[in-house]
Amino acid sequence: MAREVKLTKAGYERLMQQLERERERLQEATKILQELMESSDDYDDSGLEAAKQEKARIEARIDSLEDILSRAVILEEGSGEVIGLGSVVELEDPLSGERLSVQVVSPAEANVLDTPMKISDASPMGKALLGHRVGDVLSLDTPKGKREFRVVAIHG
């Protein structure tokens, strides 16, 4: 049996939107490929080969998204008392006062460029956050090295 993929509601919706965009791209890539095949005298044409490769990449992305979505289990919003999958966590460095906001998500949703930063529950940082409560101080491995953070707030 295929393993379930836990997603937040927003993550599920974002992946559905990506799937729709990829399907639109596939239609366009198919149209371009057909036009190239009809106009090409030489089937070894590099433009034709590039179009075939692009179509294959899009199809692979669609397959991947469909697989993830078919196994998706949408998470219920948490109580906000304990950090779990889907929780948005406000952290503060007790020494500098620097604040950091992260959301603990499944690997399928992880994206450090999002705001708040989406951290995989399978990552070292994600694993370290799980189960903590407001007021807890924990040591996290960050790009700046090991740092102490205090949990200031937990949402969802």
From Swiss-Prot:
Keywords: Coiled coil, Transcription, Transcription regulation. Signal peptide: none annotated. One of its GO terms (biological process) is regulation of DNA-templated transcription elongation. PROSITE patterns: GREAB_2. Inhibits all catalytic activities of RNA polymerase (RNAP) by partially occluding its substrate-binding site and preventing NTP binding. Inhibitory activity is regulated via a pH-induced conformational change of the structure. At pH above 7, Gfh1 is in an inactive flipped orientation that prevents binding to RNAP. At lower pH, Gfh1 switches to an active orientation, which enables binding to RNAP and inhibitory activity. It comes from the Bacteria. This is Transcription inhibitor protein Gfh1. Belongs to the GreA/GreB family. The gene is gfh1. Residues 1-74 form a coiled coil. PANTHER family: TRANSCRIPTION ELONGATION FACTOR GREA.
